[in-house]
Design a protein with these regions (language model features):
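S1/OB-fold single-stranded RNA-binding interface
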Residues: 2-235, 239-247, 253, 257-261, ...
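Electropositive polyanion-binding surfaces
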Residues: 153, 158, 163-166, 181, ...
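Short intrinsically disordered, low-complexity coil segments enriched in acidic
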Residues: 2, 485-486
């Protein structure tokens, strides 16, 4: 074990490089500038300091000049050399010059809060976490007296760095989670989550706060909401979906048009600003989907119950409601808080069967003729919207999507290609319609003619960045060859 630790401790200069101050040995080095950034480390101990907002302007640091900085740390770095190298030809036929900067770390501003995952090794009363990570070249020394209960030799664990003393070959740390035996499904899944600092459980106080939220809808809750509880409403989701995020409502109007509602759960009604649940959601940022499980942003009572649009349950929602002609033209639109009660829960296969049979299949008396006709009509409208969208210059980014089927223990048993059909497009088109309607409403200050308003309110739009010039350049020869062949 000692041999391994010394080997990873690095070269002689490595000890000096961990001094906190910029040492006198560097007086001959000219410092071009100082930058602050995040460490991105390789398995060999090399470091790239990534500067926020400047991903293509990183600084290379040799293993001997890292001063004990590790992957994910925030550091100050002195840039000591810079040169320009010819880059790839850009889309305008010129070659962009690439900056190649080198430097050394002069201060560790903040240690990373992300744990490192490895295997616990114990010899006598000494303990280490042996690293298996591609961005952590050093094992972590653990104080034997701090080992958590249940931690045994050979187990996978997650550890945080406490510090790296001058002259020591490895950093010191402590174990924050015992993940289990390597190779077991739960262990490996938890290891993935731990490596990316994704919590797979909620603290008891967060769970308790969510459990205190009432699931009863009162007249007070309905005040100011448009009532869709008696309007035909349904959801279409994957077969294995546990929460139902959005729903569609459908109603024929006397003038021959259709009233179509796109509804999502009104999470803001339940998760109030500044509450412990709100703060936890901000920390998590999003739900994370693994092959065999979901790591939710909100506790189960919220994501799978209160905010899941389950059939035959009254729900508080936020909605985009449009009046649409049979030709797919939008006549009116409305946005606001609503209340719904979903009548049906379909999976994509079930909805597809109705579409392909023109509403005649499946022969299930529990599925009313009204919802069959609604799905068939909505599909025709969705195809019209889709055709119009592509005619206006939309690009399809559809690629084959692979799905992994697992058994009850989480073991993969089958990999298959997910086939996208009309039922998927139906949901996709109406979700896009809702998003686009909101963006147009803000940009035009509510005008129906689609013309922009200079006095429009400030809004956050999703705008794709400019294509990478090097990638465009590399596409040119391929496109030319393809066109010549045809």
């Amino acid at each position: 074990m000692q041999k391994r630790r010394n080997r990873q401790g690095g070269e002689k200069g490595g000890r000096k490089s961990r001094d906190k101050k910029f040492g006198s040995r560097q007086k001959s080095k000219r410092v071009l500038e100082e930058v602050t950034g995040k460490v991105q480390m390789t398995r060999d101990g090399y470091v790239f300091v990534i500067i926020e907002g400047e991903p293509d302007n990183d600084v290379f640091v040799k293993a001997s000049k890292t001063r004990g900085a590790l992957n994910g740390d925030i550091v100050r770095c002195a840039v000591t050399s810079e040169r320009k190298e010819a880059g790839e030809a850009n889309g305008r036929g010129r070659k962009d010059a690439a900056r190649r900067r080198e430097g050394e770390i002069i201060e560790i501003v903040e240690r990373s809060h992300k744990p490192f995952v490895g295997v616990l090794h114990i010899v006598g009363r000494q303990a280490w976490v042996l690293m298996q990570s591609r961005n952590m070249p050093y094992d972590i020394s653990i104080d034997f007296n701090t080992l958590p209960e249940g931690a045994k030799r050979g187990m996978k664990v997650a550890a945080l760095i406490d510090g790296w003393d001058k002259g020591e070959p490895t950093p010191k740390g402590h174990i924050v989670d015992v993940l289990g035996m390597p190779g077991e499904n739960d262990t490996e899944m938890h290891a993935i989550l731990a490596e990316y600092a994704l919590p797979y459980r909620f603290e008891p106080e967060v769970e308790n706060a969510a459990d205190q939220i009432s699931d009863q809808i009162t007249e007070k809750d309905l005040k100011g909401r448009r009532d869709f509880r008696n309007t035909l409403t349904f959801t279409i989701d994957p077969t294995d979906a546990k929460d139902f995020d959005d729903a569609l409502s459908f109603k024929k109007l006397d003038n021959g048009n259709y009233e179509i509602g796109v509804h999502i759960a009104d999470v803001s009604y339940y998760v109030l600003p500044g509450t412990i649940v709100d703060k936890e959601a901000q920390e998590r940022g999003t739900s994370v989907y693994l092959v065999d499980r979901t790591v939710p942003m909100l506790p189960e009572k919220l994501c799978n119950k209160l905010c899941s649009l389950r059939p035959h349950e009254e729900k508080l929602t936020f909605s985009v409601v449009v009046e649409m002609t049979p030709r797919g033209k939008i006549e009116n639109r409305w946005f606001g808080r609503t209340a719904i009660c979903s009548d049906y829960r379909f999976d994509y296969d079930g909805a597809q069967q109705i579409i392909e049979s023109d509403g005649k299949e499946p022969a299930d008396p529990a599925i009313g003729q009204d919802v069959r006709e609604a799905i068939v009509t909505l599909n025709k409208l969705a195809l019209t919207l889709r055709k119009r969208r592509f005619a206006s210059g939309a690009i399809s980014f559809e690629r084959p999507e692979m799905k992994v089927e697992v058994d009850a223990t989480g073991k993969p048993i089958r990999v298959y290609e997910k086939i996208t059909k009309e039922a998927n497009w139906l949901i996709e088109e109406f979700m896009l319609l809702a998003n686009r309607s909101v963006a147009e409403f803000i940009a035009t200050s509510g005008r129906m003619d689609g013309k922009a308003d200079k006095k429009a309110k400030t809004f956050v739009y999703r705008v794709h960045g400019e294509p990478n010039t090097e990638k465009i350049a590399s596409l040119g020869p391929v496109s030319y060859t393809h066109l010549r062949a045809h």
